[in-house]
């Protein structure tokens, strides 16, 4: 997943906390957090399923790629772009679209539309503002939190790269150190998953 599940839960809590009182009224914030968390996790899982489908298709094309001299990454990108267009999926990865965050601006907007639609149907809350204003508040909160996450992610990767010995990116040791430093960096920004 592009975002760790614990971070998605934190993100959901923060979004609900930031829009409660101003954009929505709820007597059951835990239920609203659950709605937000479920939707975001489902959206992230859809991207993972798409990537798995692309990998399965790539296995079928391995001989063709070898004969034509096409790299795995290029073919992955081509097949994924084709499936994204065919299935009308909004691309989740912000780095693929040039956004500075892990999630693309388009994906954040797509999720905000779906959240507002779910909120309108929910009996656990009441919208205090116009639908679009609520959606814009969600996008703003989402973006601010993801920008902090991006800073923490970048700082943790830089920390691992600055270790005296050479640790190749993608190795198990790199991943373990990066997760440790990532948690430390998030704490510096006041992001704790236990709350």
Segments (PLM) and residue ranges:
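Alpha-helical oligomerization segments
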Residues: 152-195
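Charged, amphipathic alpha-helical regulatory modules used
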Residues: 2-100, 110, 118-144, 155-161
């Amino acid at each position: 997943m592009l975002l760790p599940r614990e971070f998605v839960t934190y993100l959901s809590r923060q979004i609900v906390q930031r829009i409660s009182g101003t954009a929505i009224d709820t007597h059951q914030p835990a239920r609203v957090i659950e709605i937000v968390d479920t939707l975001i996790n489902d959206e992230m899982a859809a991207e993972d399923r798409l990537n798995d489908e692309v990998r399965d298709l790539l296995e079928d094309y391995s001989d063709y790629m070898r004969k034509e001299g096409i790299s795995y990454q290029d073919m992955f990108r081509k097949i994924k772009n084709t499936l994204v267009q065919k299935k009308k999926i909004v691309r989740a990865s912000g780095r693929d679209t040039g956004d500075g965050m892990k999630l693309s601006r388009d994906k954040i907007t797509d999720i905000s539309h779906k959240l507002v639609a779910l909120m309108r149907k929910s009996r656990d809350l009441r919208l205090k503002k116009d639908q679009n204003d609520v959606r814009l508040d969600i996008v703003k909160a989402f973006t601010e939190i993801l920008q902090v996450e991006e800073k923490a992610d970048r700082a943790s990767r830089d920390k691992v790269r600055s270790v005296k010995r050479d640790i190749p990116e993608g190795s198990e040791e790199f991943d373990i150190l990066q997760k440790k430093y990532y948690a430390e960096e998030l704490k510096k920004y006041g992001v704790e998953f236990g709350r």
